[in-house]
């Protein structure tokens, strides 16, 4: 791989996928009203991305088993989910991007602005948390249908770019990719094998601040 960090999903990702039984929704206040983003049944992708990155940064091995609702790791993942949304402004960012036309999202925001930032992060050894916009809607209740992944490497071939990502929905899988062509004429498209039921419309770099995860054996 042309550019990569030391993170590898099969080794450093959480050992379980983003599938949870129904649990209490965590409702947060935003300028758009209250938005529930912590219902475990709807997924905890952002919390899993941040938690995996926290374990990696501290040199700890992620726990091997899926935590129950009273487990400190589960509570930590939920807390990191809220952190990953950067309430309220992060929620508004998803909403603004959901409402924009594909041409603007792809060329001006993702390809021209975000891809160079992601590349720089990888080139300096820092995995890049990404907010993935999948929804085209003005309905704020659909914000939670967007997704979050962790980019840990990239490969270019001609004008084609392939991002290697840790997708919590896929578990510790090293073969998950998002691909695009930044110089494609017309409206460029993203191809991907993320474990989601929607197209990828755009992505942006998510601001990450480390946190201390629940104790685990040191490598």
Labelled PLM ranges:
Residues 1, 7-16, 21-30, 193-219:
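Aromatic-residue hotspot detector
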Residues 3-112:
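Cysteine-nucleophile protease catalytic domains, especially the papain-like/related folds used
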Residues 19, 48, 133, 166-168:
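Structured loops at beta-to-helix junctions and adjacent beta-edge loops in soluble globular domains
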Residues 22, 51-56, 136, 155-157, ...:
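Short loop/turn segments at secondary-structure transitions that flank enzyme active sites
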Residues 107-165:
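Active-site-adjacent substructure of cysteine-protease-like catalytic cores
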Residues 142-146, 155-219:
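Cys-His-centered catalytic/binding microenvironment captured across papain-like cysteine peptidases
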């Amino acid at each position: 791989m042309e550019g990569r960090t030391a993170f590898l999903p099969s080794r450093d990702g959480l050992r379980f996928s983003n599938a949870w039984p129904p649990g209490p929704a965590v409702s947060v206040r935003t300028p758009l009203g209250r938005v529930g983003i912590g219902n475990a049944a709807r997924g905890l992708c952002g919390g899993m991305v941040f938690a995996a990155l926290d374990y990696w940064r501290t040199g700890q091995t992620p726990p091997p088993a899926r935590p129950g609702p009273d487990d400190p790791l589960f509570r930590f993942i939920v807390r990191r989910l809220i952190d990953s949304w950067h309430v309220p402004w992060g929620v508004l960012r998803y909403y603004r991007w959901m409402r924009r036309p594909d041409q603007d999202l792809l060329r001006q925001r993702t390809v021209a602005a975000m891809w160079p930032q992601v590349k720089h992060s990888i080139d300096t050894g820092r995995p890049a948390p990404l907010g993935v916009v999948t929804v085209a809607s003005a309905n704020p209740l659909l914000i939670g249908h967007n997704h979050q992944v962790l980019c840990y490497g990239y490969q270019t071939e001609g004008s084609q770019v392939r991002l290697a990502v840790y997708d919590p929905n896929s578990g510790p899988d090293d073969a998950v990719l998002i691909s695009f062509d930044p110089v494609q004429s017309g409206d460029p498209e993203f191809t991907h094998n993320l474990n989601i039921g929607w197209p990828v419309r755009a992505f942006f770099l998510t601001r990450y601040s480390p946190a201390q995860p629940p104790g685990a054996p040191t490598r």
